[in-house]
């Protein structure tokens, strides 16, 4: 049975995925599908490290700037639109290149994870857990997951309410443990997954510099927009890069304190990304910071894969 080949480029935040993808795409006749859960939103660009207008012109991108943060958008929507993008790219005779850092979304696209049925049932389940979170807080929500599925809970930080909500939602929709999803998956595509990583200190230094660069590019203004619209339920409220500035806007903390908090949150997020990638996906790892030939090495891996 024919299985569509795709290339996936993953790695922690700030490692250089976009840069490498833009180098590789013309050489392998590829178009890029964003595998980032936040780049789909039109209103937030700096904090989501969205490709620039020039980069978007260089190579055709999919799942970037297609929704408003006030729209409902779930992993099921991402998979549906991602599959459509893969088909469109393949129909042209081009190679789909998925690039991003949202491990669960990428995994759900590459593999047939059981995500439950669409429709009102999905919405009502999400609302139920969201209400529980609002009434009891992130720690209690995580404890609830720990009771239902301790294996899944161990892989999620108690303060990461977004992932806890997702796990509880999947359990409710499917009637199966979130941690058992991996045992029930089958591949949707024949995927070569290339991962970028380097030693932790270098990755963390890049993250810190990247936050400074984002601040210079106008991140604070973008965060203020998110803060000013917090009364309307939207997707960016809990996103790293925005919520860290809320205490500054409310007068509780200094700007420097919030910038440092963002750097810390970004470093922790990078660590969680790597943990997910290493446990959930089969990856060919390359080091873009130590290896000057990383582009050539990635290209060789891709050519070998495509010629199989």
UniProtKB/Swiss-Prot annotation:
Its cofactor is Mg(2+). Residues 36-39 are annotated as: Interaction with substrate tRNA. It is an enzyme of class 2 (transferase). It catalyses: adenosine(37) in tRNA + dimethylallyl diphosphate = N(6)-dimethylallyladenosine(37) in tRNA + diphosphate. Its EC number is 2.5.1.75. ATP binds at residues 11-18. The record marks 102 as: Interaction with substrate tRNA. It comes from the Bacteria. Keywords: ATP-binding, Magnesium, Nucleotide-binding, Transferase, tRNA processing. Coiled coil: none annotated. Substrate binds at residues 13-18. GO terms for biological process: tRNA modification. One of its GO terms (molecular function) is ATP binding. Pfam families: IPPT. Belongs to the IPP transferase family. NCBIfam families: miaA. Catalyzes the transfer of a dimethylallyl group onto the adenine at position 37 in tRNAs that read codons beginning with uridine, leading to the formation of N6-(dimethylallyl)adenosine (i(6)A). This is tRNA dimethylallyltransferase. The lineage of its organism: Bacteria, Bacillati, Bacillota, Bacilli, Lactobacillales.
